């Protein structure tokens, strides 16, 4: 009984004995997650100074894979079922391969601040997936939020480079947001048999395997890259790609999902601050206005879900 991890999760007596982390510890974990993921746009921008987008994605996740493998040795993970292997590779494709290659290519001509806002638009696409793929009912309120969100996206893009200079790079960042929405939907509907850490490991490892198509030329790129870029890529592999997922799993274990996701709205302003300090970028007024519009639309989507849960609980 003691050696069975599933029994430990449902044993009420043990739950009383296990110490609950202090609010400060949870708050620090949330702040760590925000800081890690807000660093990504700046880290990618620096990495692209010496690496091609595919090389940068592969190197970043080779580092993340090794780091998570070391943690898995000590922490332990759930072994996958053979029937779940296609699903795990699909998760890796949408969460790692497609998502990060699209982000890297997109950020070649999009500022780090605009990138951080566009990448946060994934809940808007999740709503579209819920309606047109999973055939869920979508309220008029949620449709209004989606429309408002896309208005904000247009404002961000026009404020960043101008609509006259609009090209496929911003669309690729939106593609990355769509990819993340598909990953989240697959995880929600089909991957409940695994804990968060195991699922993150398999998504990272399978996604990294698919990124190996970019292996030719990577060694020479590593040798030619300056030290500043190497440190930036190392930080990308360890912090946003590995440690942040562990910290996020810790947060979700002790805080309900709707409340925890509220902290993610701090990522775009934090990312803009990091980019301002590290890259000397100054977001334009239109980018700031569009950012507020996008974040309000996404926040309104989540608030509607939360109100619905409260009403259901009262009934």
Regions found by a protein language model. Name each.
Residues 55-66, 95, 100-137, 142, ...:
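Specific alpha-helical transmembrane segments that line the substrate/conduction pathway
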Residues 19-20, 28, 57, 61, ...:
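C-terminal-most transmembrane helix of multi-pass membrane proteins
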Residues 2-58, 163-189, 312-315:
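Glycine-/small-residue-enriched transmembrane alpha-helix faces in small-molecule transporters
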Residues 57-59, 114-121, 186-208, 237-277:
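Helix-helix packing/entry segments at the starts of transmembrane helices
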Residues 22-27, 49-54, 58, 80-86, ...:
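Juxtamembrane helix-entry segments on the extracytoplasmic side of multipass membrane proteins
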Residues 68, 126-128, 132, 163-219, ...:
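Transmembrane alpha-helical segments that form core, pore/gating elements
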Residues 36, 40-41, 69-119, 155, ...:
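Specific transmembrane alpha-helical segments of multi-pass solute transporters/efflux pumps
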Residues 68, 89, 129, 138-158, ...:
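Hydrophobic transmembrane alpha-helices of multi-pass small-molecule transport proteins
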